[in-house]
Amino acid sequence: MKTKNITSTILIICLCISMCAVSCTDRTNSEETGEIVPDPITMNTDFPLPDSLPDGEGERVKVILLLGQSNATGCSITEYLKNNIEASEFERYSNGFPSVLINYCLDDHNATSNGEFWKVDLTCGAANGFFGPEVGMADVLSSAYPDEKIIILKYTMSGYTLHYHWLSGGERGAIYNAFLKFAETYMNYLIGKNYDAKIGAICWMQGESDTTEFKAAHYYDNQTAFVSYLRSDLSKYAENGGIYFIDAGISNSPYCEPSYPEINEAKKLFSEQSPMNIYFSTIDAGLTVHKEPEGDPDWGHYDSLSGLKLGHLFGQYIIQSYDSRGE
């Protein structure tokens, strides 16, 4: 197992990546909005193509996209998970899920599978010693579809906004365009390897960095545009019936003040516009951010059991989305 003991240094690095990335860039003030507007960012769009899969021979695979910021990246602490669950369960997560593969690029190549498709285990998070929602997703999906291959394409940018970074002026922004190249690169690889690969759902865990009053006021319109771009640009890879958008609400952490209620209300309102938009409240689900590390909690990220539960919830709604297609 690759996971090592957690050190305060790694935790600080992860926290800085996820919550302070935008604050570390040069900015200019905008008199019109009252916002401190970040300078444009440049993304690395070099996505390698190692040949890591056998010929698919027409095998049908469900493809799920996992997008967002640090709680999608994976900053829940593996060591605490080990202490909070049965040893046999932890061993199962550590050994991984051979039928659920992941290809990931996190924080502009800060952590990456280097274009390879790996089985999901506890080593696919922001850094060594952290895990993300893909673990809970794989747990649920491997049980629901024991005879099928599931593929997760995970692309995240910790600490960055929908308003300025995934989008820019309501149009496709730097992160979006880099993500799109990532998705197209590996969907084309799967198809070229003779897999019948189709995207059935997008799981979105984002919004914590949009909780100023100005950005929150624009979140509904931004998300409407964002999902429209996703469905249009990925339409050639879409599952029969289209692509579901499964949206997790953000926490009520102090880091999400003042406008976490407005962000979550925007997400909920968006979900009501189509049966293919699904929203769930992480607050109502009881997910927590205040317990770990013990004595000095990382208020920005889900505690270990909550990080696992976040993935379970995503997995359950993915299953619901396929059930609605009659599968």
Residue ranges and their predicted role:
Residues I10-S18:
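Bacterial N-terminal signal peptides
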Residues C20-S23:
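C-terminal motif of bacterial Sec signal peptides marking the signal peptidase cleavage site
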Residues T25-R27:
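Bacterial signal peptide processing site
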Residues N29-E32:
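Membrane-proximal, proline-rich intrinsically disordered regions
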